[in-house]
Amino acid sequence: MEKIIVRGGNKLHGSVKVEGAKNAVLPVIAASILAERGASIIEEVPSLTDVYTMKEVLANLNVGVEYENGRFAVRADRPLKTEAPFEYVRKMRASFLVMGPLLARVGRARIALPGGCAIGSRPIEQHLKGFEAMGATVEIGNGFIEARIDGKLQGTKIYLDFPSVGATENIMMAAVLAEGTTIIENVAEEPEIVDLANYLNAMGAKVRGAGTGVIRIDGVDALQGAVHSVIPDRIEAGTFMVAAAITGGNVFVEGAIAEHMRPLVAKMREMGVDIIEEEAGLRVIGPEQLKAVDIKTMPHPGFPTDMQAQMMALLLRAEGTSVVTETVFENRFMHVEEFRRMNGNIKIEGRSAIVSGPTSLQGAEVGATDLRAGAALVLAGLVADGYTRVTELKHLDRGYVNLTEKLKALGADIERVEEHQENESLEAAELI
């Protein structure tokens, strides 16, 4: 079993390049199924376990896939299989995103009930509601969801009860080949939605309104392969921004797009962090003393839930009391117990966490309960007294490429080791 060992105390300096966005690339890969002719070339694809899982899902559907050096090539101009089995889908909820494209392209999809991070209920009813509104028959049983349509899906008006990112993406992909016009209201407005719409339009789709609360899609007869470069990962960028701020460092985050991160930039500036917007990215300079702020996660353009845990690590170092309210997922405070193991002073009251700081964090052995919690614990380790050991790295590898190496290049005292190598690593560190 691997673990990350961090010794706190070093300020981070230098430059770090952000990878392509995990939450953008997965739906884009799924959308490639829609192309009846030609190859799709997707660039800036991060080397993540979720990407490899999606590659396996597509290969199992008889889609031709190649992935090398950040470039993903897809050919779906062949007879497609229609079942995504549990062995793949259980690893990652985003596998469910192939349902919309399969339903639109071949009229049938049988997908195992999805897996992924255990951070509360993320119901798929919104996806299915959209498919049914477009004329599909949906059945759930024996661990599978099966959707069928005789003929083509029909354009219609769909209202989402909640602006779910996954439901917005899945319904968008189904609607591009539907007969007539589909209008989706109360949709997600994330930058990743805009990125998917740009890719679909490059394939020949007619999608308008992405990035607003209403998306209008005029169905077309067929799509073809296209070339697309994935947007930078705003959550990875945000994680490195917090790393710079929490250590009092000075880091240039190459590829960070301020327009995609306005809530985070605003809150960090409110805490006293100096953030300079440059043409190629953002420079982040941490202050001597951070100020407490309140944070409430919301669908975009509100504060992103995927940055809640990392910001909580930063708030532990701030002067005063901060309140973090989680409104998107009902079970996303599992990292609080791990912070407490590091001497974090946090109380839970319903959907809010009350953070009292500044806390003198202490190194401890902690577990990554989910993807973003893992990153947050590494961030806390950067300023903790002594050694912090972060385990359960399988979650971390789903969303970060070479996190340890990138932090080390910025000056962090950090190693990723096998359990049997830990003593050797610590002994070597003591000699330096």
Swiss-Prot record:
CDD domains: UdpNAET
Annotated binding of phosphoenolpyruvate, by residue: K22, N23
EC number: 2.5.1.7
Annotated Gene Ontology cellular component terms: cytoplasm
NCBIfam families reported in the protein's UniProt record: murA, PRK09369.1
Recorded family membership: Belongs to the EPSP synthase family. MurA subfamily.
Name of the protein in question: UDP-N-acetylglucosamine 1-carboxyvinyltransferase 1
Organism: Shouchella clausii (strain KSM-K16)
Upper taxonomic lineage: Bacteria, Bacillati, Bacillota, Bacilli, Bacillales
